[in-house]
Amino acid sequence: MGITSLDKRHTARMETILKYKNENLDEVYQSLQNEFYNDSILLNHRTYIEENNLGYGEKPFHVIWREIINSQPKKFKFLEIGVYKGQVLSLVKLLSDLKNKECEFYGVTPLSNVGDKYSKKYDSVDYALTIESLFKKFNLEFDLNTNIINGSSVEEDVKNKIKQLGIFDVVYIDGCHDYDCVVSDILLIKEITKNGSYIIMDDASCYKPINRIGAHLGHSDVCDAIKDYIENDNCFEEVICVGHNRVFRKIK
């Protein structure tokens, strides 16, 4: 599917968001945060996540996910690298169901509290049960053996399993934040995406002109990997930056 075909699926709201990329990033963030509070679906999901310590991120990210899902066809494929406790994976499924879209979704994650140099260790919980419980809370279909690949995305056997799933329309990268790991993930997505696919990078805005007080801009390893392997690659264009999330689209 080419870029022209994908653009025809954009809602008017998505077109407006696309125009944000050249505007003040702090204003973009605030505008989307205001919009978040006017969407009860997003508000309910994010509130549950925050109250139960089920994820990181920020409120405006939910709005971007809504618009990305709105832009997808009736059937599409989604991959998340670094699921943690299931916030984004469940949100994508929730929004897909609300739009009567058939989303074939997968998450790659070690199902443990293993960290990286930025996060030495995460909570000591049963990650499989935590993710299953989150999906159950929102009445979302989920099968651990089908929807989760247990392991690290840098492991060769895990990479092979991902490649066997085919081509993805949307990929979210929030796995290991170490430079070599991020590079490995970026090289992988170049193989498993197509023209028009969205790639969302977390912790990615270290070098962006964001002046919001208290803003978390990301991690230097992630940002350096993006600079070296996405920004310097004419296969991608940046769609929008919201806080420490950056959205790219594959164009060739």
Residue ranges, per PLM feature:
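Rossmann-like AdoMet
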Residues: 1-56
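S-adenosylmethionine/decaboxylated-SAM
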Residues: 32-252
